[in-house]
From Swiss-Prot:
A GO term from the CC aspect: mitochondrial intermembrane space
Domain notes per entry: The CHCH domain contains a conserved twin Cys-X(9)-Cys motif which is required for import and stability of MIA40 in mitochondria.
Keyword tRNA processing in record: no
Entries under Gene3D superfamilies matching the protein: 1.10.287.2900
Protein known as: Mitochondrial intermembrane space import and assembly protein 40
Biased composition (Basic and acidic residues): 91-101, 237-251, 272-283
Mitochondrial matrix side: 36-46
Disulfide bonds: C152-C154, C163-C196, C173-C186
Annotated membrane topology: Single-pass type II membrane protein
Domain of life, per lineage: Eukaryota
Known role: Required for the import and folding of small cysteine-containing proteins (small Tim) in the mitochondrial intermembrane space (IMS). Forms a redox cycle with ERV1 that involves a disulfide relay system. Precursor proteins to be imported into the IMS are translocated in their reduced form into the mitochondria. The oxidized form of MIA40 forms a transient intermolecular disulfide bridge with the reduced precursor protein, resulting in oxidation of the precursor protein that now contains an intramolecular disulfide bond and is able to undergo folding in the IMS.
PROSITE patterns xrefs: CHCH
Hydrolase found in the keyword field: no
Length: 283
């Protein structure tokens, strides 16, 4: 009469119950069955963000250094009509000149050095007048203050040599001399300087040689001067007058008699003195 509850439940009809299932997987490519239309606000925001990104990309300095890709070849500069492209023949002379340039520079550097050495060696050989002229030009002597710069290179260092004191005395005397001709009152000081030069031939040998050559030339000029005057006389009358003047000078210097007086030979004078007084009276 009473059935068990378990059997009653099993035999009882079960109503259709929907099975609860989880959410199915959905891919990006798959779309839902129903899509909602976007609002105008959402579209406006999207357009504003896109335009802002483009503006920032074009105006910002972050992307300024990025190279731009271009498929067009770069335009090459056009050569002028008067200029031609370099050739092998035109390049060879330039390469040779570039090779010769270092040698020429070395020669040019050696030439001033040799010139300076020659100038230093020739500086002691200059006369006092030349030294004074160079001193005026190179500011060794200041006429306004009356001071002499003994360190001037134009003096050749002679103011500090073994005969430096004598050279200073002679040079300063010549510079300050007011006699005519200039330097006549400084002869003694120049002689003292030359004596000092002779005492040091190892230092002033070149100066002594120049002095001897100058003296020899002066003596030769003095001896040859009458001969040159005789040669220059083109008229026989002038030659005769010059010869007569020379003869008169020689006679006056030797104390001889003039041409108007009688000239007695020496042998005749001796023979007359040997004669006896009787022979002289007979004559």
């Amino acid at each position: 009469m009473f059935r068990p509850a378990s059997r009653a439940l099993l035999r009882a009809p079960t109503p259709a119950v929907g099975v609860a299932r989880g959410p199915t997987r959905r891919f990006i490519s798959s779309s839902t069955g129903s899509t909602k239309p976007r609002s105008w606000k959402n579209t406006f925001i999207r357009v504003g963000l896109a335009s802002g990104a483009v503006y920032y990309y074009n105006t910002s300095s972050v992307f300024a250094e990025t190279p731009s890709l271009s498929f067009r070849p770069e335009a090459q500069p056009k050569h002028e009509d008067g200029k031609s492209l370099p050739t092998l023949d035109s390049i060879k002379p330039k390469s040779r000149e570039e090779k010769k340039a270092p040698a020429a520079a070395a020669d040019a550097a050696a030439t001033p050095a040799s010139t300076g050495a020659n100038a230093q060696s020739e500086s002691p050989l200059k006369s006092a007048e030349e030294l004074e002229a160079e001193a005026d030009q190179q500011a060794a002597f200041n006429p306004e203050t009356g001071e002499i710069n003994w360190d001037c290179p134009c003096l050749g260092g002679m103011a500090y040599g073994p005969c430096g004191e004598e050279f200073r005395a002679a040079f300063s005397c010549f510079v300050y001399s007011e006699e005519e001709p200039k330097g006549m009152d400084c002869i003694d000081k120049f002689k003292a300087m030359q004596d000092c030069f002779r005492a040091h031939p190892d230092v002033y040998g070149a100066e002594l040689d120049d002095d001897e050559e100058a003296g020899a030339e002066a003596n030769a000029a003095g001896v040859e001067q009458p001969l040159a005057a005789e040669v220059d006389a083109s008229v026989p009358v002038e030659k005769h007058e010059q010869a007569k003047e020379v003869r008169d000078e020689v006679k006056s210097a030797a104390g001889e008699v003039a041409e108007s007086e009688e000239v007695v030979p020496k042998a005749l004078d001796v023979s007359e003195q040997e004669k006896t007084p009787e022979q002289q009276t007979e004559k």
